[in-house]
Design a protein with these regions (language model features):
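Hydrophobic alpha-helical transmembrane segments of multi-pass membrane proteins
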Residues: 99-113, 143-149, 187, 216-224
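Hydrophobic, aromatic-rich alpha-helical transmembrane segments
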Residues: 94, 98-105, 174, 208, ...
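Membrane-interface extramembranous regions at the lipid-water interface
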Residues: 2-5, 16-94, 114-143, 150-186, ...
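Extracellular/periplasmic helix-loop-helix junctions in multi-pass membrane proteins
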Residues: 194-223
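N-terminal hydrophobic alpha-helix used for membrane targeting or insertion
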Residues: 45, 107-110, 211
Length: 253
């Protein structure tokens, strides 16, 4: 006669033990954070930075025109060119230079506004990736660009924190691109400020010629900084997209 199998004893207390509830998420020191796509803002920022580059190239041409007029004043006088002709050429060069300055200012203001929106977007995304990897508050991500002296160092620090939080897990921190962009940005700001003051004080043809050359150098630095900024924006945007797609925890956030 075959005996039915004896029932196996249940583990002690298993029937009465409720299933474990999921652990609550760790609190974030910067407030609620959720992933939002930075792609559209990143592309818009890159396009507007391209507009900044175009305005800077226009400014280089205008500065070169001023340089050329100032350098040929003496030669033109010796060659018999009338004073009226020289004044007309100088006025045209000055008008072109003024138009370039307005173009640069307009392009920079629009690009900076969209860049800041993108910057805040990637900062919040970075908080999802690493809530505790940011030494500065979220509000500083915006205001740090406008506070004198602070804006020379803190935006770069915040960008570095965003970059590190967005890089693939297990990879080393590589901030060479960020550092190169920030270096050219700061040098361009400083050189531009001094050359603008020098250009305003220039009176003689030689002084005007020197100031125009210095302005061309400043515009060239701005162009390099803008090119590097485009690379930073597009690369960081891509890093965040790939991290969100490949990190289950981040994707759920």
């Amino acid at each position: 006669m075959t005996m039915p199998p004896s029932p196996q004893p249940a583990e002690q207390g298993s029937a009465a033990r409720p299933p474990l509830a999921p652990l609550p998420p760790l609190p974030s020191p910067h407030g609620p954070a959720w992933l939002r796509s930075p792609v559209a803002l990143g592309r818009a920022t890159a396009a507007l930075l391209g507009l900044v580059i175009a305005a800077d190239l226009f400014a280089v041409w205008a500065d070169h025109n001023v340089y050329d007029v100032a350098s040929t004043v003496t030669i033109a006088l010796v060659g018999g060119e009338s004073a009226d002709s020289l004044v007309r050429r100088a006025d045209q060069a000055d008008a072109l230079n003024t138009a370039a300055a307005y173009a640069q200012t307009g392009a920079l203001v629009v690009a900076a506004a969209v860049f800041l929106v993108w910057f805040l977007r990637v900062r919040v995304n970075a908080e999802v990736f690493n809530p505790f990897g940011h030494a500065h508050s979220r509000s500083w991500a915006g205001w740090s660009w406008f506070v004198p002296f602070v804006n020379l160092v803190r935006p770069r620090q915040i960008m570095a924190e965003i970059w590190d939080a967005s890089r693939p897990a297990g990879t080393r921190s590589r901030l060479g691109l960020v550092n190169a962009w920030w270096t050219f940005w700061i040098i361009g700001l400083v050189v531009g400020r001094f050359t603008t003051v020098a250009a305003g004080k220039a009176e003689t043809a030689q002084q005007i010629q020197d100031a125009a050359f210095q302005l061309m150098v400043a515009d060239g630095l701005d162009i390099v900084a803008a090119v590097l900024a485009i690379v930073v924006v597009l690369k960081l945007t891509g890093m965040q997209v790939r991290k969100a797609q490949g990190d289950p925890v981040a994707a759920e956030g």
